[in-house]
Every structure is written in C-alpha cells, then in structure tokens.
Amino acid sequence: INCLGVEVFVENTSISLPQPPGFVSLEGVSSETYGMMQDLTPETNRLLAGFITKNDAKSLLQGGEAKLKEYFLVQTFQKLEDKTFTLSEFGQFRKSIRKDQESAVSLNQEKIDELTKYGSDKLSDRFDADISFGISGVIPLGVSSETAHAIAVSSLSKYEESINGKKSDRLIAGTTVFQLVKGKLLYLYVYKDYVKDA
C-alpha cells in the first residue's frame, strides 16, 4: 500500500497533501470506491483526493468491501480555483464562517435534500441499484480550531440510507476544515461513523 502523500493541482498551483496517520490514498486502491466519492461530490466542487483507513484499503485490495467508518476527502469550490487569496482575504473568510457558526447558520434542509438527491441518483446509476440517502437533524458544534491559515467547524448528523428497500440509520460526526495553501482554498472533510441504526 502506497504510504506517500498526494500531489494535486488547483489551477496551475501544485499542492502536496500529506497522508493522515493511519490512512492511505484511495485513488490508487479502488477506482470504483473513488468514483463513488466523486459521485457524492457536489456539482459545485471538485474532488482532489480521498483517504481511507489502512484496514479499509487492505480489505479492498483483497477483494472485500470498505467499511468507510472513517475517511477524509479534499475538495475545492470550482468557481474559486482561479482565485489566489491573500492572508487578509482569508481572514475575512474565516470571520464569515465564524459568524455563521456562532448564529448556528448552516445549510437549510431544502439544500441538503437537493445535494443528497444528486448523490443518490449518481450512486444508483453507478451500481444499477435503488440507492437513496438523506441527512437530517444536523447539529452544528461550532468552530473546533482556527489558525491564520485554517478554520475547522464540526457537526453531528443523522444519515438515513436505503439500498433496494433495505434501510439503515447512522450517526455521523463531521468536521470541515477550510485550509489556505499557497493562496488556494481547500475544503477538507473528515467523517467518523459513531452509531449505526441510531
């Protein structure tokens, strides 16, 4: 299993993404699972990299399935890829994120439903199955960390899944890190599955 980081490009800027401890790059392990992550990426974003646990990687390489109870995704917002942020501009961006969190402002349910419908349709096509999922009960947990180059916000969500009529629920803790690297804005999404059939 390749334990090196991943080099990505945002516009013409090369960025080296270090590999999180205990995780490996998904792209070289399973093109199908990586494609699934691309299907779940909003149309406004671009998936740069995905990282899964070493145990999941071993399972996939041996022909098994990944549990995906913990994983990382790195994305960009496509309309901002050509913009190079100054530290001052990113400071204003952090301020707006902080303000939204302090007032518990998050995606409204209609927008969440729109995003999950898009992902459900893509996954159904990919696996030729009736797949749907929804996100409800989002609880913002506020800003979990902040530096001059990054701000992280966390939340708890209930994921409801249905595959060919078989339903299950999961409680997911998620953290989104908005990271400034070489003037480019990266979105790092970290997910951990805590409870199944919550």
Locate the predicted segments by residue.
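Surface-exposed amphipathic alpha-helical segments
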Residues: 183-198
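Start-of-domain marker
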Residues: 5-44
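Extracellular structured ligand-interaction cores
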Residues: 12-14, 20, 69-73, 173-174, ...
